[in-house]
Amino acid sequence: MTEHDLSLWLEQWVSAVTGEAEIDPSKPLEAYGLSSRDAVILSGELENLLGVKLDPTIAYQYPTIEALAHALTASQEDKQGVRGARAGRMQTVSASPAQRDIAIVGRAGRFPGAANADELWALLLDGAVTTGPLPAGRWSEYAGDPYLRTKMKEEATDGGYLDDIASFDNEFFGLSPLEAQNMDPQQRIMLEVAWEALEDAHIPADRLRGTPVGVFVGSSGNDYGMLIGADPAQAHPYALTGASSAIIPNRISYAFDFRGPSMNVDTACSSSLVSVHHAVRALRDGECDVALAGGVNILANPFASLMFSELGVISPTGGIRAFSDDADGIVRSEAAGFIVLKRVADAVANEDEILAVIKGSATNSDGHSNGLTAPNPDAQVDVLERAYADAGIDPATVDLVEAHGTGTILGDPIEATALGAVLGRD
C-alpha cells in the first residue's frame, strides 16, 4: 500500500469513527476527539490491513495521519536513518567522576504505612499494599456541599494516605500557633523531613547556617490553597505565604538560614525527579555545596481526585497493576521525602556514608504530542538516551529500571516501548 492510499484509508477511518466530514491529514488525531481506546483499536485495524505487528501506541508515536501514513510505508533505509540519528545522541561525556557524580548521603520521608525510609523498605520487601479507603474526617470541610458529598460517594477515592498530616511542633521551628495553623501541611511536613534527612546524613542543620545549601522541592498542585480559597472568611493573612507552593522550599531555607538556590518544581508526575535533576546541576555548577532534593504530595481536598476518577484515570478497583493486562488506572497517594546530596569528592573528603551515587540525569518535554497530557514515545526515548549519555553509561549494561508505571492502557505500553528502544537496542 502506498503512502497516499494509506493516508486516504486513515482519513476515512477517522471520519467514520468521529463523524467528521472534513479530515485534515496534518492535524493531530487528538483534535478530532479520538480517545486512547480508539487509538488502540486503530492500531489493531492497521495490523489487519497491513499484515504487520504494530505497537498499540503507534498513533501516539505519529500523531497525525500524515506522519502515521509516512511511518508505516517508509523504506527500511529511512528507518535505519532514524536509528542512526538516535545513536548519535548516545555519545557519552568524559569528566572527573568525583566532580560530576553526586553522592546521596542522607534520606528521610513519610509514606502510607511507613513513618520513615527504613519502614518503606520493609514494606517493599514484604510486598505489602498500604493503599486503602479515604481516612475518616478527610475532606470533611466539603461534607455540607450536597454535590460534592454525592460525588465523594460515587467516585473512586481509595488511595495511599498518611496517618497524620496535622501534628506539628511549631515551637521547634520558631513558629507561632497562628502561623502554623495557616500553613499548608506540605510546608509543615517538609520542614520536619528536611531536619530528619540532615540528621540521617549526620550533618547538624546549625552547622550549615549561612552556607550555600540548596533546597529543591517537587510539588504539583495546591490543594491547601484551594481549601483556603473555598472559605476566605476563615483565612488569616498568614495564609498568603502558608498556601504558596513556592514557600515550601523557601520556608526551609528561611528556617535554617540556607543561602543556596531554593525552588519549587512543578512538572506534574515528574516533579520530584526533576527537583533532583536541578539539585544535581546546581551541585555540579558550584551553586551549592549541599542540597536537599525531594518532593511532597498531600491530598487536602477532593477536586483533583474526583476529576481524575470521572475521567476514568483512577483505578475503580483501587489496585496498582502497572504493566499488567489487568491494569485499570492509577491510584493517587500522599508522601513526602528528601535526599541529601553532595559532590562525591566532598562526601569522600568528609568521610560521609555514601548510600548511592547519581551519575547522570536529563529532562525534556514531550513537545507537541497527540494531546496535551498524552506521552510522546520519541521524547521518552530521547530523555533516556540523554540521561545515560550524561552518566557515561552504556544502556546495554543496565540491569534494573524503576518505571513510572501508570497502569493505564496507553501509558504502560509507551513507557515499555521507550525502555525497550534504549535498553534493548542490541
Residue ranges and their predicted role:
Residues 1, 20-21, 30, 34, ...:
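A short N-terminal beta->alpha junction/helix N-cap motif
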Residues 96-426:
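Condensing-enzyme catalytic core of the thiolase-fold
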Residues 2-93:
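Phosphopantetheine-dependent thiolation modules in NRPS/PKS and related acyl-activating systems
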